[in-house]
Amino acid sequence: MGVPAGNAENGKKIFVQRCAQCHTVEAGGKHKVGPNLHGFYGRKTGQAPGFSYSNANKAKGITWGDDTLFEYLENPKKYIPGTKMVFAGLKKANERADLIAYLKESTK
């Protein structure tokens, strides 16, 4: 299927509105309700040091990348049944693509 090209500036707005209450992205950022996302791109699920993940997240065993994030962000609880993440998801493909573009830039 492939992930459409996203706009990182739009993605930042989505992150601030929908994600920042539970996640940080900067190096050395604190865990909140959800883990700090710095360095998560290319890492397996449930691996942020010092964060207490659900068994479902630890056991999923996928690597975060464009395709996995695109599917996960549509419906997190469907993609990882048992996840602690309470976010309902982003149904619009362009919003998911924008958020992914922002996360790729901001979590390096």
UniProtKB/Swiss-Prot annotation:
Its main location: mitochondrion. The keyword Electron transport applies. Keywords: Electron transport, Heme, Iron, Metal-binding, Mitochondrion, Respiratory chain, Transport. Pfam families: Cytochrom_C. GO terms for molecular function: electron transfer activity; heme binding; metal ion binding. Heme c binds at C19, C22, H23, M85. Binds 1 heme c group covalently per subunit. It is found in: Mitochondrion intermembrane space. InterPro entries: Cyt_c-like_dom, Cyt_c-like_dom_sf, Cyt_c_1A/1B. The keyword Iron applies. One of its GO terms (cellular component) is mitochondrial intermembrane space. PANTHER family: CYTOCHROME C. Electron carrier protein. The oxidized form of the cytochrome c heme group can accept an electron from the heme group of the cytochrome c1 subunit of cytochrome reductase. Cytochrome c then transfers this electron to the cytochrome oxidase complex, the final protein carrier in the mitochondrial electron-transport chain. Belongs to the cytochrome c family. This is Cytochrome c.
